[in-house]
Each structure stands twice: as C-alpha cells, then as structure tokens.
Amino acid sequence: MGQYLAALYSQIYGLCLDVSLVEFCKPTSLCLTKIADACNKVHKIHEYVSASLLQQNSLEACALSLELSHLLENLKTRLFFIYHALLDNPTYFSKLHSSVGLCDLHKKLNVQFYNECGIEVNLTLINDIERFLSRLNCVFYCLSSSSALLALKEALTFLGQLRGISPVPRTDIYITSSSCLECVLETSVVPNQGETLNELLLNHNCHHLVERVPPEPIKGLFESELQNLGLKVHIATDTIEQSVGKHEAVLQESLAYLKAHTIFNNTPKQVLELSNLLYWNSGQNQPSDSGVKCSELSKIWSRENELQKYRPKLNNGEPPGHFFDLHSPQGTELLFCGGIFSSTHDTITALKQDCSNTFMKQTRLTGVAKRQNELFMRLSNILYGEEVPTKPKQTESALKTCDQSDASKNQVLQEAELRKEAYLNKLSKEGFRKLQACLSTHEEMLNSQLSLKIWGSVVYKQSATLLNHFLFRQSWVTQASLPPSVNGSPEQFENSKFIKSSLYVKSLSREYLSTLRLHFFALITGPLTTQEGLFPSPPNVQLAHCLEAAHFMPHQKMLLNEMIKPTMEPQDWICSNFNEFYTIHETDLNGVQYECWKYLRELVLSVALYNITWEKNLCIYRTDHSCPTACSSGIKEGLYVTYESHAPLILVYSNKKWIFKDLYALLYAHMQLANNGAHR
C-alpha cells in the first residue's frame, strides 16, 4: 500500500509543479480545454482518494499521507481557479497574483490543557508551526488526546494553506534564522568548545523546514538550446574586452613550451626548473593586473539582454507576455531574484569576483604583490635564455648594523628599505587573506538567503509523529475495559490501602534512585525526541533535547532535576488520595506540568518499590510506541501509562487490558494475577 501511495504522491507532486508554472505563463499560450480536462481528472482522483487518506490519517498518519492530502485539496481548488481566470485573459495575472485584501495566512489556536487551562497560540510562519509542535512535544502529558488532536487538526489545516501547490514556498512564510528541533539535534552532536547550545545556534541558518537546492551551472545552457532550434547565437563574452596581462601571456607561453615535452624525452635543466616553478606556484592566487575594465555583474546583465532579443524569434515575432515579462525586476531587485537566463548563484559569484578585482586594483598592494613573487620573471628568463639575476645578499639585521659605529648612511637606508618592503609584503598577504575569508563568509550568507528553496519534510514528519502519539493513546483507552472490581469500590479501596501500608515501611537505595531518575525522564520525554535503535541516546540526553527545542526556562529545569532526590522516602512521593491518580487540580500550565511530574514520579518509584517488596517484575510502558490491535497477543504484559486523566493506567495481563484510576489498586490486582492467575 505504501508503494501505491508514494507513486500517487510523485505524480501529484509533478502535476503541482506544472500547474504552479502555468500561473505565470502567457494566458493566450494556454489551452482552455486541456486545463478543464486536467481539472476534471484531479477532481475525480480527489473524490476517490480523499476518503481513504482521511481514514489513514485518523488511524496511523505518515508524512506522505498528510502532505498528499494537502496537495490534492490545494490542486483541485487552484486548477478550478485558473480555469475561471482564463475565461478573461486581460485580468488573468491580476486574479491569480493579486495581493489586494486582508491576508488570511494567520491562525490563532486555543489549546485546552487539563483542568480547563487554556493557552492561545498565534501561527503565521512555518517556523511558528514547528515551534508549536516542539512545545506541544514538551507538554504532551498535560492535555488529553482529544484536545491535542483538535489543536493538531487546526494547525495542519493552516499548514495546508501555507503549503499551496508550488514546491517553492513563498519567501514571506518562513525565516531561516530561527532554529528548529532538527537543528538542536544536529548541533548537540558536534564539539561545543565550551559554548552553550544557545550560543552555537545564535547565527545558525536552518535548512530543514525549507531545503536549499544546490545551484546548477546554467551558463551556456540557453545558447545550446537556441542553437539546437536552428538560431545563430552570438553572445559577446565581455562588453569590453579584457586586456591580457603580460604575466598571463608569459604563463601561457610557458605551458605551451612544456607541452612538447614527454616522459620519453630527456629532461633539460631549463625544462625541469620551468616545471618546478609552475608546480610550486600553482597554489598561489596571483593578483591580476588592473586590466579588468568590465565588472562580472555587468557581463551577466549584458548576456541577459542579448538573450532576451532572441525570444520573439521563437514565438513567430510576437512579443513575450509572460508574468515575468510584464513585471520584470529592475535595479537592485535583480540582485535578489536573478534573471531568466541567470541564477542567483551566478549573481553572487559575480559580486564576489568584482569585490576581489576592486581590492586588487589598489596600486600599492598590487605593486607589493608583484615584487613578492619572481615566478614570471624567472619564467621569462628561462624561456628566452637570459641569465637569472641573483638577489643581492641581504645585509645583516638592524641591531648589528646599529651596533657598528662605522655604519654608513647607505646601509641604514638599505636596511630601512628592506624593512619597509617586508612590512608591505606582510600587509598585502594579511589583507588578501582577510579579504578572501570575508568574501567566503558573505558568499555563504548570501547563498543561504537567496538560493532556491523547496518545501522540506520535517514539519510533516513531526506532525505525523505527534498525531500518532495521541491517536494511539486514544485507541488504547477505547480498547481497554474496566476491571471486575469496579474502580472506586470499597474492595479496591481496601486493596489500595494494603499496598500503601506495605510500601510505607520500605525504602529505595540511593543507587537505585539514580537509575529510576532516568526511567522518570524517559516517561516525560516527548515522542519527537524519543530515540529507538541500536545506539539510542540516554534518557537524560533525549529529555535535554526536548526541553531545549521548547526553550525551557532554567528554573524549570532546576525543579525537574529536584523531583527525585537521593534521600527520598516513600512518604515523600506516595499520595494518600484514593482513585485520584492523574487528577489535576492546578489551573495554570506550569502548575499542571509540575503536578503531572509528581504523578509520574509516584508511578516510577512505587512500581519499583513494589517489585522489590513482592519480588515481581512489573514493567512500565508508554502507549505511543505501538498501535493497539484487537488481538493483544503481540503486546507485552505490563503497566501502560496513557497520560489520560480519566483512564491513566492500563494493566495488560493474559491478553486482557484493564483500566485503573488508582495505582495501588492496580498493583494489588497484578499481585493477585501473578500469584493465582485470576483476578479476585
């Protein structure tokens, strides 16, 4: 079934790409009949598939099914809108791309936690949805599955509005400077060099919500296409010819001289020295002469204008009338969106080259760089048979020169000239190195901001994971039943009191409490950061990722760390109330969360003490790791916590599931079942 879903997704995704391009095409170039035919086909597919997708997402969702449902709904609506816009060609673009009116890409969610604690969440960007999912992942145990599913449904509806049909998201619905949960997970595995996670993520660019497409070289691509169509294309590479420097000519002549030499020839001394000079100086970026008279950016725009002239020839002389012809970018806008025949990567590369050329035009630094390296001078001497001038022997250091009482004025001037030349040499090296580092940094920043981006799968994966968590919780409660002894009955009260009295006189060792702390951390770690596999992270690390992604406050981390202390006794965690496990009394979210911590702490410590006292092996499991089935033979026996206030605990034993509201009544029932094999 998954293969058919993936095949349908790929076809719908490709059709969405085509339709998103149709929105910018000249209306007279489109066939109204084909648009209507495509609209009818998509409508039939939507009718046939939507019910199955809805059922799939209500049982066990996946990122593919969630995104496919959004694409189908948006594609059906958009094609219908395009068809009606084509009926009036003059207003085609204004109907499709008009920004008149109020923006509807805003959503306000009201999330209801336990005990009627409500929180309002404002959604505007894709980042807001991801942030909401990360925070819900941190407090998943503080609300019922029905409330969570209602909030997630509204968030997914808003995500569908942002998704549209184009694989390229609008630039006003996301920001890359805000980190996501995946950024936290990736940053946590690299060396931090003593810096905190917030410091490492300070200038971080996120490429998970929207993925950056690697740039492709497109220079010469359109020229080849035009030539294949039979057009004679001649594009001047430079608006103004760039003069070839003397040094460049010598270098080319040297390479031509070496071309005639093979490994079967004897190697003369001049050839060997020439080869060595070329080899050892190949890694040095020699600054070009000031012969560059045309900027690289100007060349791009000149090429753009030249290629634009060939477009009417391909359209029988008719002027082009696509959206980008009627609303073409001008001035500085070209720097941010590029042109039809050039990409933003070409623009950024040209800007970098122009900055480098401008720097190297400075007379002093260029002159110093020329004097620094004698490569071209020596190449010329070898090629033309001249003697290589030897460098005059440098004078001794300035200190020894000054100590000599008979030092002449010429020696002092020569020493000063050598020092000046060494200083300028170092200055040019350092300046050029800093320039290249600066240009590389800004090139990466511009590529991050201006490069083409497409929709990522992170938000849909996180949505599917959280949906399944709450769907499984709901299913577990639905398929479980009440025990033979009704919850809250006098019999259960006596059973609960017996277990409590027995546990009060026992205690847990300090070493065991440290181990149980990790088990407690595992129960409050959200499903988005719960790792499974051969080498999962420890529970405390997984919880740290969960809290960092939700921007948990330091004082809250302190309270959480103090929940289980090495000196705790049973009276510190056992609640005296009967049949009120996971009953929330606080009215604010922080209070609700702290009360949930206390209940889960009581669960972990009391079950551990029960296992020691009666030599049992009752294990605690979460209900979000597996979907309950009608046949429970594949489910492990043990205690399952659902985090549902009305049915928090489920005991699975002998292929049966019983709901308990009191922890100690459940422990008594498990003891009787383990001893006698029947529930008394």
From Swiss-Prot:
GO terms for biological process: viral DNA genome packaging. Coiled coil: none annotated. GO terms for cellular component: host cell nucleus. A zinc finger (C3H1-type) spans 180-208. InterPro entries: UL28/UL56. The keyword Zinc applies. The keyword Nucleotide-binding applies. GO terms for molecular function: ATP binding; zinc ion binding. ATP binds at Y610, N611, I612, T613, W614, E615, K616, N617. HAMAP family: HSV_TRM1. Belongs to the herpesviridae TRM1 protein family. Component of the molecular motor that translocates viral genomic DNA in empty capsid during DNA packaging. Forms a tripartite terminase complex together with TRM2 and TRM3 in the host cytoplasm. Once the complex reaches the host nucleus, it interacts with the capsid portal vertex. This portal forms a ring in which genomic DNA is translocated into the capsid. TRM1 carries an endonuclease activity that plays an important role for the cleavage of concatemeric viral DNA into unit length genomes. This is Tripartite terminase subunit 1. The gene is TRM1.
